[in-house]
């Protein structure tokens, strides 16, 4: 089962469960944490808002955001690539898609960090629970207001929120609580994974300068480079499921109610699937990794993450020359789920702009 929220809450004493009312209600409605038939229903309605044509229309905007952020990063005194580019790019893109103004990005960064430490932590300490509950309550109020305003005053320049409000499957539509919860999911998942794609990706390229040189010489290899980054050091470490009944797998008994951690990072280095799996090679062929999951829970935002990587990666390599790591061993997030560096300070020489 994908539902690991209900078992977690059910094991808590009543007072502790009540103290997580908002975060429990929100996560319990996330499409990634529910099973069919509810998942089938949510996914069908959300798919109507995440069409290929809607994503394709975002390409010029993403390219413009990339250029603006790189220009600002070059002029900044902060060498941290995560703070200067890897975080604000996907955050700005997804915020615009769900109708959140850029002025609120710092607020959402704080909320998202609180959720990430709760969802991905090996141990949800009282402090992590308290911060996650507070942020879930604030996000519920925030998106509830946005959705109410969109219902009252529809706009011509529609966001994913507008499409989710309008989505219908027969007479069925997303409820208010489902709209709020999955708007938060889109914002959360829509930037966390792509931030790690860029952070882990640049780190891998800098540790393999031959591959960086190949990509710099031929930017058309960006698509393959993104796929190899996703395989070699992708943004997701594990995918968790809960046993519904006792089952024996490879001689090991998994009991009903036990959590099973699928190590996606390890699977993408499986020598039975990939030749020389620990080698980073942006020209690798047949690179069918599973970083975005598999089956009915395959990541809804995978095409968007790939598009951002394919646009942003060659642009930053063109803009930032002679890149060097200022910290050979950067810190990583403490998470069982997400895999990414917290910060990545670099030195570089900015390329001169092309004169028209």
What are these regions (language model features)?
Residues 1-356:
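Cytochrome P450
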């Amino acid at each position: 089962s994908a539902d690991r929220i209900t078992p977690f809450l059910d094991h808590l004493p009543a007072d502790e469960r009540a103290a997580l009312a908002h975060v429990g209600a929100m996560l319990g409605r996330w499409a990634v944490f529910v099973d069919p038939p509810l998942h089938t229903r949510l996914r069908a309605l959300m798919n109507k808002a995440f069409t290929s044509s809607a994503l394709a229309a975002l390409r010029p905007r993403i390219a413009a955001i990339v250029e603006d952020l790189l220009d600002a990063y070059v002029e900044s005194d902060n060498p941290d690539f995560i703070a200067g580019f890897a975080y604000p790019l996907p955050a700005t893109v997804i915020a615009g898609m769900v109708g959140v103004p850029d002025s609120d990005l710092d607020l959402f960064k704080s909320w998202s960090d609180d959720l990430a430490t709760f969802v991905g932590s090996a141990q949800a300490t009282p402090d992590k629970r308290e911060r996650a509950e507070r942020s879930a309550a604030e996000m519920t109020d925030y998106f509830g207001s946005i959705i109410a305003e969109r219902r009252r005053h529809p706009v011509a320049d529609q966001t994913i929120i507008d499409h989710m409000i309008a989505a219908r499957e027969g007479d069925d539509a997303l409820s208010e609580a489902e709209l709020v919860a999955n708007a938060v999911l889109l914002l959360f998942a829509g930037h966390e994974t792509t931030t790690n794609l860029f952070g882990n990706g640049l780190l891998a390229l800098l540790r393999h300068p031959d591959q960086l040189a190949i990509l710099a010489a031929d930017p058309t290899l960006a698509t393959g480079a993104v796929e190899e980054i996703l395989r070699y050091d992708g943004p997701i470490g594990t995918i968790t499921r809960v046993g519904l009944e006792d089952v024996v797998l490879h001689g090991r008994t998994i009991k009903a109610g036990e959590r099973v951690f699928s190590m996606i990072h390890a699977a993408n280095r499986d020598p039975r699937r990939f030749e020389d799996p620990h080698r980073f090679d942006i020209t690798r062929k047949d690179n069918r990794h599973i970083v975005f999951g598999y089956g009915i829970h395959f990541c809804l935002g995978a095409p968007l993450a790939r598009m951002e990587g394919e646009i942003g990666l060659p642009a930053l390599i063109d803009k930032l020359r002679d890149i060097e790591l200022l910290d050979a061993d950067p810190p990583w997030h403490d998470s069982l789920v997400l895999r990414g560096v917290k910060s990545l300070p670099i030195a570089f020489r900015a390329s001169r702009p092309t004169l028209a």
